[in-house]
Swiss-Prot record:
Species whose genome carries this gene: Solibacter usitatus (strain Ellin6076)
Name of this chain's protein: Probable chemoreceptor glutamine deamidase CheD
GO molecular function: protein-glutamine glutaminase activity
Family: Belongs to the CheD family.
Record has Mitochondrion as a keyword: no
Lineage of the species this protein comes from: Bacteria, Pseudomonadati, Acidobacteriota, Terriglobia, Bryobacterales
EC identifiers of the protein: 3.5.1.44
UniProt key word Hydrolase: yes
GO biological process: chemotaxis
Length: 169
């Protein structure tokens, strides 16, 4: 397996069966994975903040830092590799309250709400999520099978089982 690390404020696309996309230490950030099971193409975004209007220059410099600029770029890149927008299935993890126990800023919740709004407007189904709470999470997406793994509190679980192989209905 070829592991491709998705860093903070980063986005990667996988198109080969042996590739695994992984992002680590999702606290208040959100890790969004999207996958087309028929084309066996997927992508992952690790964004930090909900809205680029707080710093438009930084949003232009690195659109993956923000939900409103990063999510459309992720969809564009995955579809550019051959995925069909109508078949995209999305999963999200993160959005925790890590350093803000009184939820004064509640960046995690704001990140999650931005995600829901953007995906709804784009017509993309959010099929699953592991958001909120106070735990850091790690996510891995196996491109060949579509399996999605979540690690939280030292325990790993499969969020999405294997999809039928490429070329099916």
């Amino acid at each position: 397996m070829e592991q491709i690390i998705v860093g903070v404020a980063d986005c990667r696309v996988g198109h080969a069966p042996e590739q695994v996309l992984a992002t680590y230490a999702l606290g208040s950030c959100i890790g969004l994975s999207i996958y087309d099971p028929k084309a066996a193409i997927g992508g992952m975004l690790h964004y930090m903040l909900p809205d680029s209007t707080i710093d438009p220059a930084r949003g232009r410099e690195n659109p993956y830092m923000f939900a409103d600029t990063g999510i459309p770029k992720l969809v564009e890149q995955v579809c550019g590799r051959g995925a069909n927008r109508r078949r995209l299935i999305a999963h999200a993890a993160g959005g925790a309250s890590m350093m803000d126990p009184q939820a004064v800023f509640d960046i995690g919740k704001r990140n999650y709400l931005a995600l829901r709004k953007i995906l709804w407007k784009a017509g993309i189904l959010l099929a699953g999520e592991a958001v909120g709470g106070t735990n850091s999470r790690t996510v891995r997406l196996e491109i060949g099978s579509g399996r999605l793994w979540l690690q939280e509190n030292g325990k790993q679980k499969e969020l999405v089982p294997s999809f039928p192989q490429k070329g099916g209905n």
